[in-house]
Structures are given as C-alpha cells and as structure tokens.
Amino acid sequence: NIKDTFDQKSLLNPHKIVKPYKLDDRQLLRYKPNYKTENIDTRFDWSNWGNFSDAIEMCNNNGACRELNDGVMCPSYRVTREEKDLVRGRANTLRLALSNQLPKNSFVSKEMFKTMELCVSCKACQRECPMGVDIAKMKSEFLFYYYKKFSMKIKDKIMSNLPRNIWILKLTSPLFN
C-alpha cells in the first residue's frame, strides 16, 4: 500500500484515505460463517433457486420494493408504508424464521401470518424486483403449513373451495338476484 509506505503514522490526510476491507474479508459477507437455514418439505418446486430458503435469500435488500412513484410494486406497502408489508420485510422475516434467528416455530406462527396477510398475491414483486423475489408464491407455501397447524377461517374455506362448489351458487342465484 503506497500510503502505508510513505505515511506509516497516518499523519498526512488522516481519515481521508482509508484502508478498505479486502474483497474476501468475512466481514463483508451478508451471512456469518455459522449461518444455515432449516430445510422444509415444500409444495412448490423451488429447484430453479436451489430450494425454498435459497429463493427467499434472493432478496438482497436493495430496496427497489420501496418504490412509490413508478410501477406497481407492492400495493399493500404503498398503503401502509411499513417495512413488514414490504417485499424485503416479508422475505427477511421468512429468512429469519427459517434460519432460527426468531423464536422456535416462528415460520408457522400467528406473527408470521400477520406479516404475510396483506400480500394480495398480485405478483408485482416478481415482475419489478431486480432479483425476481416472488412473495406471492412464498405466501402460498407458508399458508400450506399455516393451515395445517391452524384452522382456516370460514371465508377462506368458501373461497378456496369456490371452483368445486360453484354449482351451489348457481342454483341459489335466483334468491339473491
């Protein structure tokens, strides 16, 4: 280093020329050496990303999802302006749960449901995120496990079975029209 050679005591331009980290320095890495995620059996095929956890980790926190002026990025965030309702917030919450940085069983919890519930599954995140993070698909994966543990609300049961039971509505439509 030229500065170290000519200015060993850092008297010339103190704090103006700094010693950068080496590019392979572990401090620059996003995840610590002991970082690992829980591997869960998923309903969707996540092999394009490696696995479900790897797909979540595609979020690199670049903040493009905070865009309020152009595009359609995350309508729920545009309304609430809260980080938990942001694509990045949801992805990070999922990542923290699957890497056991949140309390045990956080992945399938009421708190995680609150984080995911305002996602309207419009897939704007997948289209507009530079990394293609698909929170709508991740929400579906989460809901599969959530509803195995907690029962579905009646409105959710009706909507999820609508294609199967549409004939009932057709028969009763004269009563409502």
Range-by-range predicted roles:
Residues 2-4, 48-51, 56, 62-67, ...:
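A general structural signal for short secondary-structure junctions and capping/turn motifs
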Residues 38-61, 99-121:
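Ferredoxin-like iron-sulfur electron-transfer modules
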Residues 103-177:
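Iron-sulfur-cluster electron-transfer modules
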Residues 1-54:
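Polar, glycine-rich mid-to-C-terminal structural blocks
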Residues 4-12, 66-68, 84, 100-107, ...:
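Secondary-structure transition/capping motifs at alpha-helix termini
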Residues 14-16, 58-96, 124-143:
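Iron-sulfur cluster-binding cysteine motifs and their immediate structural context
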Residues 1, 88-91, 113:
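Long, C-terminal-biased catalytic regions of enzyme "large/alpha" subunits
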